[in-house]
Curated annotation (Swiss-Prot):
It comes from the Bacteria. It is an enzyme of class 3 (hydrolase). PANTHER family: 5-OXOPROLINASE SUBUNIT A, UNCHARACTERIZED PROTEIN YBGL-RELATED. Catalyzes the cleavage of 5-oxoproline to form L-glutamate coupled to the hydrolysis of ATP to ADP and inorganic phosphate. Belongs to the LamB/PxpA family. The gene is pxpA. Keywords: ATP-binding, Hydrolase, Nucleotide-binding. Its EC number is 3.5.2.9. One of its GO terms (molecular function) is 5-oxoprolinase (ATP-hydrolyzing) activity. It catalyses: 5-oxo-L-proline + ATP + 2 H2O = L-glutamate + ADP + phosphate + H(+). GO terms for biological process: carbohydrate metabolic process. CDD domains: LamB_YcsF_YbgL_like. This is 5-oxoprolinase subunit A. Forms a complex composed of PxpA, PxpB and PxpC.
């Protein structure tokens, strides 16, 4: 069994360099919610050094709230903003001898494209326009995954080690109780259940079906690195290979 392990980087966390030794894919902030040209260059350089797949992490234009504010923008605006961000990272990667492999939206853009078909279409269209060979990463079973498949893109369905799930397979909003799993044992058990058995227990107790092709690790938690190391160790014990 194989699984991709990804992390969002270039967002101001001190653990970026160490996380890049543990993950197989890096989603690099492109300036709209965090990061800038220099952090993008630095993250690309470290990803290449560690053999980690380079990906863009585009966002709504919302540095004030770290890309977590809901926005109702025209799809054409979202298309242009996404193309701008992923195009910048693709060029930075190419300039350093690397290749951008995937795109994963950030924050509220990620959440809204999971449910809003027009927004999902705008993202998928931008990714296709940039490079049809790019992999589009989105929430398992989401509108974004459906849109990517409609454009003929390779898609990668994502699950979260430390997020609570609702009965329909969507994430519990961060503003609600149960959104974040802070117990390491619970997060580890949830991850293995999703990867090995394709299901997750919702906060209301029902099982939701999920397709786990990549697992997101958040690097901003207090015990993020320790959990990442433990997850890698557990995967090795279960003969689950970590690779992009």
């Amino acid at each position: 069994m194989k699984i991709d392990l990804n992390a969002d980087l270039g967002e101001g966390c001190a653990s970026d360099a160490e996380l890049l030794t543990l993950v197989s894919s890096a989603n690099i902030a492109c300036g709209f919610h965090a990061g800038d040209a220099q952090t993008m260059q630095a993250c690309v350089r470290e990803a290449i050094k560690n053999g980690v797949a380079i990906g863009a992490h585009p966002s709504f234009p919302d540095r004030e709230n770290f890309g977590r504010s809901a926005m109702q923008l025209p799809p054409e605006t979202v298309y242009a903003q996404t193309l701008y961000q992923i195009g910048a990272l693709a060029t930075i990667a190419r300039a350093q001898g690397g290749v951008m492999r995937h795109v994963k939206p950030h924050g509220m853009l990620y959440n809204q494209t999971a449910k809003e078909a027009q927004l999902a279409d705008a993202i998928a269209r931008a990714v296709y326009a940039c490079d049809p060979a790019l992999v589009l990463v989105g929430l398992a079973g989401s509108e974004l995954i459906r849109a990517g498949k409609q454009y003929g893109l390779t898609t990668r369905e994502e699950v979260f080690a430390d997020r609570g799930y609702q009965a329909d397979g969507s994430l519990v909003p961060r503003s609600q109780p149960g959104a974040l799993i802070e117990n390491e044992e619970q997060a580890l058990a949830q991850t293995l259940e999703m990867v090995q058995h394709g299901r997750v227990k919702s906060i209301t107790g029902e099982w939701a079906t999920v397709t786990a092709q990549t697992v997101c690790l958040h690097g901003d938690g207090e015990h993020a690195l320790a959990f990442a190391r433990r997850l890698r160790s557990t995967f090795a014990e279960k003969e689950i290979v970590v690779a992009a």
